[in-house]
């Protein structure tokens, strides 16, 4: 009986088959529902993702199209600067227009009197038509300026295209005004001879006055200034500093333009570069005077060039008792030497805002001498001598001699083991380097030994006097002005010559037929040095400069030859 009772209780306790199936069915329905919901969520997420991709793609495409269609597309900070410009020059422009109208009224009165008394009326009618065109341009300029100011004050993204269109119209009007003013250009004559210097100075002063006061030109130069800022990654603290830099840039830009246009005797051209927003005072601050090297240090650690190579045949032939004789050195050495063509000169590097030119000149010299000796060009560390050479002042200046002295006493790391930062580091990290190069001594060269030293040793570290004329160099043979003080170090990598009529401006390595030039009188030949700078490949002729010299290379132009050293491996 008990067993039967337990079996009944067990039977009642077990769930029926129907209940089990119902539970399973409910579970499956929940699972299907969850799967469906997840699928819906996934589908919605996919749709949102696709919409986002399309949106950003279209936005990017539209932005690129706008940039392609209009290279003068304005940004908010550009609009802000233009607003300040317009406000600043508003009164000046009104004054110019009033003066212009008064002058035109006086001229009209004079012309009317002349017309009444003069039989030749054709020229007067022509002058009246020119003035009426100029008045029309000025009135149109006023209207456009007012419209431009209206859009600038709104300062939103939607007006960018319209702002840019107006800017283009303003620039076109400005060109028309300048074209009309060419009819009134002056010719500067002294004793019936064209005075180029006078024309350059007077023309420069007149154009500077006009450009400085005319708001249309300031808008045009603002556009060029924005392009300059973008190309050279210029960032200023605030609008006041930006305006100050803009004024400096504008003056430098006009100076560059006038040099290229008016200075016909110059053998070189200028261009805008990373220094175009530097004032003369700022350049002096950046290019500090190089450290002085006392004579006792030179005597203690360096070897005179003639003593270093005293057994050399050329030394004995062209130097008597340590002094240069009168023999023509070019009877034994080539008239053109360019170590770039021999593959032992690295491409110019960029020292940045750090005053480390001395490090780049000396380390570049070690690289070239090492490559000349070992047939293998390596890159060594400028940053190491900036951080570790205690005789130098890091980014605050130095001298190639002290850089060589450091390597003589400590060796030098490879560049990839001690990378350049363009700033001083508190610690010297040369202990991390595995491979180093060492020097045995330092060579010293006199100004009348440069040609021979280049041929026998290789590239040389030299110092020059840099000013605002020098830094704006673009191409050609530089024969401009230089600073009296030596404030910059470069690497002398060769020399050359070219017939004046064949001097051309380009950024490629130039070679010339020396046999042709040898038949030319000296007055018809331009002699030059080839120097490697440390202001990047964008400066000068792919980072290099051709600098004027005399035939024997001993005229010390721009200071080349005063302090010359080289590493002895």
UniProtKB/Swiss-Prot annotation:
It is an enzyme of class 3 (hydrolase). Contains disulfide bonds. The keyword Acyltransferase does not apply. Residues 97-118 are annotated as: Disordered. Belongs to the peptidase C1 family. The keyword Cell membrane does not apply. One of its GO terms (molecular function) is cysteine-type endopeptidase activity. Residues 1-35 are cytoplasmic. One of its GO terms (biological process) is proteolysis. The chain crosses the membrane at residues 36-56. Residues 57-569 are lumenal. InterPro entries: Papain-like_cys_pep_sf, Pept_asp_AS, Pept_cys_AS, Pept_his_AS, Peptidase_C1A, Peptidase_C1A_C, Peptidase_C1A_papain-like, Prot_inhib_I29. It is a single-pass type II membrane protein. Disulfide bonds join 354-395, 388-428, 413-433, 482-558. Disruption phenotype: Normal growth during the asexual blood stage. Normal invasion of host erythrocytes. Normal gametocytogenesis. Severe reduction in the number of oocysts in the midgut following mosquito infection with gametocytes. Cysteine protease. In the mosquito midgut, required for parasite development. GO terms for cellular component: membrane; merozoite dense granule. This is Falcipain-1. Optimum pH is 6. Its EC number is 3.4.22.-. The active site is at 357, 488, 533. Its main location: membrane. Able to cleave native host hemoglobin; however, hemoglobin is likely not to be the physiological substrate.
């Amino acid at each position: 009986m008990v067993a039967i009772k337990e079996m009944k209780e067990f039977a009642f306790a077990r769930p029926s088959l129907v209940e089990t199936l119902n539970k399973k069915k409910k579970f499956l329905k929940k699972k299907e529902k969850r799967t469906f919901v997840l699928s819906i969520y996934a589908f919605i997420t996919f749709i949102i993702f696709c919409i986002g991709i399309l949106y950003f793609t279209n936005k990017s495409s539209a932005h690129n199209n706008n940039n392609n269609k209009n290279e003068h597309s304005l940004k908010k900070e550009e609009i802000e600067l233009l607003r300040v410009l317009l406000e600043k020059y508003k009164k000046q422009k009104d004054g110019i227009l009033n003066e212009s109208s008064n002058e035109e009224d006086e001229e009209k009165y004079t012309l009317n009197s002349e017309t009444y008394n003069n039989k030749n009326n054709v020229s007067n009618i022509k002058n009246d038509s020119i003035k009426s065109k100029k008045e029309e341009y000025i009135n149109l300029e006023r209207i456009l300026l007012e419209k431009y100011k209206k859009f600038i004050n709104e300062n939103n993204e939607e007006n960018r295209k319209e702002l840019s269109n107006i800017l283009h119209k303003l620039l076109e009007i400005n060109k028309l005004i300048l074209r009309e003013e060419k009819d009134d250009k002056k010719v500067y004559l002294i004793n019936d001879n064209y005075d180029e210097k006078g024309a350059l100075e007077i023309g420069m002063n007149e154009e500077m006055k006009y450009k400085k006061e005319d708001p249309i030109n300031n808008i045009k130069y603002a556009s060029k200034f924005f392009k300059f800022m973008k190309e050279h990654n210029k960032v200023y603290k605030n609008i006041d500093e930006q305006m100050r830099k803009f004024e400096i840039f504008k003056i430098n830009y006009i100076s560059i333009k006038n040099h290229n246009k008016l200075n016909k005797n110059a053998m070189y051209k200028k261009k805008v570069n990373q220094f175009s927003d530097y004032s003369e005072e700022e350049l002096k601050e950046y290019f500090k005077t190089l450290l002085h090297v006392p004579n006792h240090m030179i005597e203690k650690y360096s070897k005179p060039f003639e003593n270093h190579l005293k057994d050399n045949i050329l030394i004995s032939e062209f130097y008597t008792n340590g002094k240069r004789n009168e023999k023509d050195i070019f009877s034994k050495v080539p008239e053109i030497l360019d170590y770039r063509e021999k593959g032992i000169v690295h491409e110019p590097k960029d020292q940045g805002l750090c005053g480390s030119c001395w490090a780049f000149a000396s380390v570049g010299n070690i690289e070239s001498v090492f490559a000349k000796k070992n047939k293998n060009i390596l890159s060594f560390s400028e940053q190491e001598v900036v951080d570790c050479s205690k005789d130098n002042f890091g980014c605050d200046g130095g001298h190639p001699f002290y850089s060589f002295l450091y390597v003589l006493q400590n060796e030098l790391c490879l560049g990839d083991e001690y990378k350049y930062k363009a700033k001083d580091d508190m610690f010297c990290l040369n202990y991390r380097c595995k491979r180093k190069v060492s020097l045995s001594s330092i060579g010293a060269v006199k100004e009348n030994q440069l040609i021979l030293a280049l041929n026998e040793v290789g590239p040389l570290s030299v110092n020059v006097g840099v000013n605002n004329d020098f830094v704006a160099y673009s191409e050609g043979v530089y024969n401009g002005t230089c600073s009296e003080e030596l404030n910059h170090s470069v690497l002398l990598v060769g020399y050359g010559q070219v017939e004046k009529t064949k001097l051309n401006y380009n950024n490629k390595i130039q070679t010339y037929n020396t046999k042709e030039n040898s038949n030319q009188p000296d007055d018809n030949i331009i002699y030059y040095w080839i120097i490697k700078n440390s202001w990047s490949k964008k400066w000068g002729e792919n980072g290099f400069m051709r600098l004027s010299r005399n035939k024997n290379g001993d005229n010390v132009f721009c200071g080349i030859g005063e302090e010359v050293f080289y590493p002895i491996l």
